[in-house]
Amino acid sequence: MHKKPTVLGAQNALQVLSTVVQETPLQYNKRLSDALSASIFLKREDQQQVRSFKIRGAFNKINALDPKELEKGIVCASAGNHAQGFAFSCNQLKTAGHCQLSPL
């Protein structure tokens, strides 16, 4: 069962992630703005070290695990972007990780 998000949890995640996640810009997109008659900005998460926002969830979760949970290593299954965030997080946190990539 998942825990309901809290303000304190978000504040803790912000503090933890500030050590590994880069602040990325919003970029105005004229073509989409014109097509949709609205001001459209794209959040450039492709500028993260792993080229995706997936680092946020992977790092925050692995960092929150108890050291006993990490002793045997951790496992994930992914089709791509999450695997990059997972591998980066395991490396940064010096934790053994095994990732099963799904075939395309």
PLM regions and their residue ranges:
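PLP-dependent amino-acid enzyme catalytic core
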Residues: 1-104
